[in-house]
Amino acid sequence: SLQRITGVSIDRNSGEGSTVTVRGFGPDFNLVLLNGRQMPASGLGSCCEAPASRSFDFGNLAAEGVAGVEVYKSGRAALPTGGIGSVINIKTPRPLDRPGFKGSIGVKGVYDTSRFESTPVTPEISGILSNTFGDGTIGILATASYQRRKASQAQFNAGWREGYLGSENNWGSLPLDANDWRGNFARTENRPDPTDIYQVTQNAGYDFTDLDRERINGQLVLQVKPTDTLSLLVDYTYSQNTINARTSSVGVWFNHDQTSSSWTDGPAAGPNFYSEAFAPGKDLAITGALAANRSINRSIGGNLEWDGPGGLRLVLDGHHSTAESKPTSPYGSNIAVGSAIFGVQSQKVDFTTDMPVISVNMYPGSAADNAANIRPAGNAFRNAYMRDEINEVSLKGGYDFDASFIK
């Protein structure tokens, strides 16, 4: 729903809203508050390292536990500083806002057709329970939600060598000499002109990822209003977001030796296709990877509000909040096992289709579908941890003037 606001765009991760960009300023430049309090942020980014970022991940919070969102795109004296792009305040329910007994439970299933192996239905359960006592002077509220989602995604990736001018003659660039000893000049169709800019494919591959995400949210609120002018509130918020991502990758690398290619017209030219032939010994790269991480946010706070005589208002607020991201696997936050099948005779990437097509021809006896031909190529075990903590106490005041010269 934030995307409906002018100047606000959503950055998505695996199809779900994660961070926001406001007025062109990225997530690092937007300050996120929870009930007016600055929240810590943690995450493991690409699952291999803790990023140097304070951007808040909205994927940690379920929409069912949010009562409203305020977006401030300009500064105000009553708001914390630090939001260059915006200040976003997430508001959660309060029991005295709706006196009496209130309760709701929602159960639904999510049917995701993106799964490679099956199309499972995953559960989403949420509930809210609120009640007031003592003629509406004491209120207790509890919210909870559980969400599980399984999805898959397929992706094509390509790496490129730095941009070349059509007049360059360096390693990796297209040959200029018609008598090139490799014969690549004759196998280059519609070669870029000397003043054109182009890039050469360095590598290409397919990634197939299965995602399993579990999100748990909960909040407890105690609100007391002994008099019409005094209100006390204590709340505790908990969120947990666990993500497992299993990725299988297959790809090719180019040596830029015996190549054939076709190119689009300049001045910025790109390949229609790029292929290369090899002597025995070239490999087809295969990788299996697992990223398993969990982010946990905890916040406990209190708020005391007093409406004094003559329009005077004082608000004392404090909270202790932590955000922690760590691996759930005993082998670390990210594991990658690399292997190779040696015996690639030729390889080609065709960029003329909606999804670029990689084709590989193997030498006899080196079939890619024969597990006996797979050789280990290297493993990587990475471990990352991030923790952010905020202890904050604030005292705010206001005075409503009631004079004829102030409108």
Residue ranges of model-derived segments:
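Surface-exposed beta-strand-turn/loop segments characteristic
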Residues: G43-E49, D112-E117, T137-E214, S239-K282, ...
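Surface-exposed, extracytoplasmic segments of Gram-negative outer-membrane nutrient-acquisition systems
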Residues: E324-A371
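Short strand-turn segments of transmembrane beta-barrel domains in outer membranes
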Residues: E70, P95-N131, A142, A158, ...
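Outer-membrane beta-barrel transmembrane strands
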Residues: S86, T92, G109-V110, V121-T132, ...
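Outer-envelope beta-barrel architecture signal
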Residues: N30, G65, P99-G103, G136-I140, ...
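Short, solvent-exposed loop/turn and secondary-structure capping segments
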Residues: V32-L34, G43-G45, T81-G83, S152-F156, ...
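Periplasmic N-terminal accessory/gating domains of Gram-negative outer-membrane beta-barrel systems
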Residues: S1-D28, G36-L61, E70-R76, V110
